């Protein structure tokens, strides 16, 4: 089991933590990461885009003029795709973009993402966040003590009110619970900050 330093919210070293190597120190599986991130990004799409074909555009039931004798081109509807205000040909329609991924692959991708941060020394273990105030300015000073000045993802098990309010006004900080943290979120940050409870959660779920 690899050992990792644990600090408090003041940036002081308080202990070391034995991390399970089968969760935090595996060789990242690139295909699993690709499949899961592709599925998670697809799930972000609403899929509500829609256009109207000639069948759904209002009007156009009557033939605009007789077939022969006018000298004009023949038409059967003013809602033909050839006309201004007519229907759209092969336009987008509502659809579900979700992609199924097996749980085994999802867990492998999550372990790969955690291990990637561990191996690149971009993982920060904090015992807990107990903030006295909900001010973002004060929380920013706390992050500076942890040497966090760029894009960061903070994963906790249960978020308290002060932590939620203090972090949401910082554009480079994302707060997420361990149960809802995604592989895409983890790989899309420079600094991964985990509380000890979050570490215990991942080691239990991904064992």
Curated annotation (Swiss-Prot):
Q: Any stretches that span the bilayer, and where are they?
A: none
Q: Which domain of life is it from?
A: Bacteria
Q: Name one GO biological process term.
A: translation
The keyword Ribosomal protein belongs to this UniProt entry's keyword annotation: yes
> Under the cellular component aspect of Gene Ontology, which terms does the record hold?
ribonucleoprotein complex; ribosome
Mind listing the UniProt keywords for this protein, alphabetically? Ribonucleoprotein, Ribosomal protein, RNA-binding, rRNA-binding
Report biased composition (Basic residues) as residue ranges: 63-77
Name the job this protein performs: One of the primary rRNA binding proteins, this protein initially binds near the 5'-end of the 23S rRNA. It is important during the early stages of 50S assembly. It makes multiple contacts with different domains of the 23S rRNA in the assembled 50S subunit and ribosome.
Task: Give the family, as the similarity comment puts it.
Answer: Belongs to the universal ribosomal protein uL4 family.
Q: Which NCBIfam families match?
A: rplD_bact
User: What's this protein's name?
Assistant: Large ribosomal subunit protein uL4
Query: Native species of this protein?
Result: Phytoplasma australiense
């Amino acid at each position: 089991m690899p050992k990792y330093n644990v600090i408090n919210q003041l940036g002081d070293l308080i202990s070391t933590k034995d991390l399970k190597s089968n969760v935090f120190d595996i060789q990242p599986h690139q295909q699993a990461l690709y499949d899961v991130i592709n599925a998670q990004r697809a799930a972000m799409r609403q899929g509500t885009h829609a256009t109207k074909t000639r069948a759904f555009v209002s009007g156009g039931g009557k033939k605009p003029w007789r077939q022969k004798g006018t000298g004009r081109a023949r038409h059967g509807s003013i809602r033909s795709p050839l006309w201004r205000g007519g229907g759209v040909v092969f336009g987008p329609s509502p659809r579900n973009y979700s992609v199924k991924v097996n749980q085994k692959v999802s867990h492998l991708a999550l372990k790969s993402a955690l291990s990637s941060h561990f191996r690149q020394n971009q993982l920060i273990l904090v015992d807990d966040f107990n903030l006295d105030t909900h001010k973002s300015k004060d929380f920013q000073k706390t992050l500076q003590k942890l040497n966090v000045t760029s894009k960061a993802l903070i994963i906790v098990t249960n978020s308290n009110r002060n932590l939620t309010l203090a972090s949401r006004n910082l554009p480079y900080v994302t707060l997420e619970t361990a149960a809802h943290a995604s592989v895409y979120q983890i790989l899309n940050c420079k600094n991964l900050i985990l509380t000890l409870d979050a570490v215990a959660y991942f080691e239990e779920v991904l064992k």
